[in-house]
């Protein structure tokens, strides 16, 4: 039985028979609109609604489904799909290995995952959208914790180490180089595809930064609220994050975060990962159920 687990509250993968079980988390889905530059969050619906680990949501390219990581009764970590129209959940991968952090690749025909292999090696793999035809994306680079596609040929990767490193890899050549160190798990392409964002530690604070590509010009944007480590881009100049039961937003040029919504009345607490659909109409929210 596979025991490799990526924790919600950590930026490393814990493996081995002695590892504790994964945290109990759920994925919620809510409508998202932007009015006057302010994000408005509609009623949030629990789309997983079960005891167990459901986490790491990302939307398909057509915004019609969510891919997410789920650990079920068999103890296996696989990728599942939730269809926004039919509200049906289907299993996408069912392998002897563990798959995490499903991300639809540029072109929309495959998705990439962090795969924990039988010998606990963590590398980047990809699958067809139906979970078939697995193949390795980068053979030499390991252990990979998280990733984001800058474009069809370039990847930004969180590589575990002391300290953790932000590594760029050109998938055409397999060549990799280190861009930064002491980074967090949140990596995301910029909405206009001009680069990507990452979070790194500056004077004990978690700071959101953006790197333009291919210029490799990086600049700090704003410090995240204390305890926050995840963000999602809602538009070219609007970022969302969470603190406790609250969603917060930041506009490019602002000096501080502003409140978007308090979801405590809906039972959403300890909000962590966020994902916004490509069409900007939906937000997926990971929370610890009451």
Question: What kind of feature is each model-predicted range?
Answer:
Residues 19-290:
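Sequence signature of WD/YWTD-type beta-propeller architectures
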Residues 1-4:
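Positively charged n-region of N-terminal signal peptides that target proteins for export
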């Amino acid at each position: 039985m596979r025991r490799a687990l990526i924790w919600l509250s950590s930026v490393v993968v814990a493996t081995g028979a002695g590892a504790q079980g994964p945290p109990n988390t759920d994925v919620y889905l809510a409508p998202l609109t932007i009015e006057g530059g302010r994000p408005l969050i509609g009623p949030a619906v629990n789309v997983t609604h079960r005891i167990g680990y459901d986490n790491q949501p990302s939307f398909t390219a057509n915004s019609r489904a969510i891919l997410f990581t789920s650990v079920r009764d068999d103890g296996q970590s696989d990728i599942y799909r939730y269809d926004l129209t039919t509200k049906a959940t289907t299993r996408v991968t069912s392998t002897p290995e563990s798959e995490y952090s499903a991300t639809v690749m540029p072109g929309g025909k495959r998705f990439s995952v962090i795969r924990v292999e039988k010998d606990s090696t963590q590398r980047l793999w990809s699958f067809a959208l139906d979970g078939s035809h697995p193949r390795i994306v980068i053979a030499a680079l390991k252990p990979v914790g998280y990733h984001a596609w800058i474009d069809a040929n370039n990847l930004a990767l969180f590589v575990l180490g002391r300290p953790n490193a932000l590594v760029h890899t050109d998938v055409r050549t397999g060549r990799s180089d280190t861009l930064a160190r002491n980074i967090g798990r949140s990596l995301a392409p910029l909405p206009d595809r001009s680069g990507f964002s990452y979070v790194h530690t500056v004077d004990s604070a978690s700071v959101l930064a953006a790197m333009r590509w291919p210029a490799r010009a990086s600049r700090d944007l704003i410090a995240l609220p204390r305890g926050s480590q995840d963000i999602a881009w809602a538009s070219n100049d609007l970022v969302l994050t969470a603190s406790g039961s609250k969603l917060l937003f930041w506009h490019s040029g602002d000096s501080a975060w502003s409140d978007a919504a308090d979801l405590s009345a809906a039972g959403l607490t300890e909000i962590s990962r966020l994902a916004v659909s490509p069409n900007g109409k939906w937000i997926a929210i990971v929370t610890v159920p009451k």
